[in-house]
Amino acid sequence: MSYKLTYFPIRGLAEPIRLLLVDQGIKFTDEHIPKDDFVSIKSQFQFGQLPCFYDGDQQIVQSGAILRHLARKFNLNGENNAETSYVDMFYEGIRDLHSKYTRMIYEAYETQKDPFIKNILPQELAKLEKLLATRDNGKNFILGDKISFADYVLFEELDVQQILDPHCLEKFPLLKAFHQRLGDKPKIKEYCAKRNASKMPVNGNGKQ
């Protein structure tokens, strides 16, 4: 089976997918399409959107749908309905933070960056810290001893927020340790080192 991930040459919505594939040892083609070139091929994609993941001949768009597809396929979605729902809930909580971050980045960076760092970011991180603590006291993965697709989403979110504010995790020891723990996984560590050396932008407008 061949896999391909198509996205812009940024981290954006595709980065948790890349991290999952890399850490799980799943070989894939990482196709980067310059934004200016996307206009002419936009109609090729469902909803006219990227990222797009190809599982053989199947085309899947919407980052959450891609992540859940991979989670079902590679057992990264919990062992039962209760665990699957818990992972989904955690994922949606991370997305709440990311939606607020994205709105600030693309719509009001100059005026809202400082209020976001001071008010919104710590409030959202506190929610995630509290939820992380409910399994194994937050000392392992979101589900406890089993990694899930949401762990890769959380890792990337924490990584991005530390670019915005390097001190944002100081009051959240469980999240800080989680980020360090996943970042030390050999395949993730190697991938992130290469990515950071290439200076791949986080967002499409260059702001981060």
Swiss-Prot record:
Domain spans labelled GST N-terminal: 1-78
Residues in GST C-terminal domain copies: 80-200
GO biological-process terms attached to the record: glutathione metabolic process
A GO cellular component annotation in the UniProt record: cytosol
Family annotation (Gene3D superfamilies): 1.20.1050.10, Glutaredoxin (3.40.30.10)
Chain sites annotated for binding glutathione: 7, 42, 49-50, 62-63
Pfam families in the cross-refs: GST_C_3, GST_N
Superkingdom classification of source: Eukaryota
InterPro entries: Glutathione-S-Trfase_C-like, Glutathione-S-Trfase_C_sf, Glutathione_S-Trfase, Glutathione_S-Trfase_N, GST_C, GST_pi, GST_superfamily, Thioredoxin-like_sf
EC number: 2.5.1.18
Protein keywords: Transferase
Keyword GTP-binding: no
Top EC category: transferase
Catalysed reactions listed for this entry: RX + glutathione = an S-substituted glutathione + a halide anion + H(+)
GO MF annotations in UniProt: glutathione transferase activity
Family the entry assigns: Belongs to the GST superfamily. Pi family.
Subunit structure: Homodimer.
Annotated function: Conjugation of reduced glutathione to a wide number of exogenous and endogenous hydrophobic electrophiles.
Protein name stated in the entry: Glutathione S-transferase
Native source organism of the sequence: Dirofilaria immitis
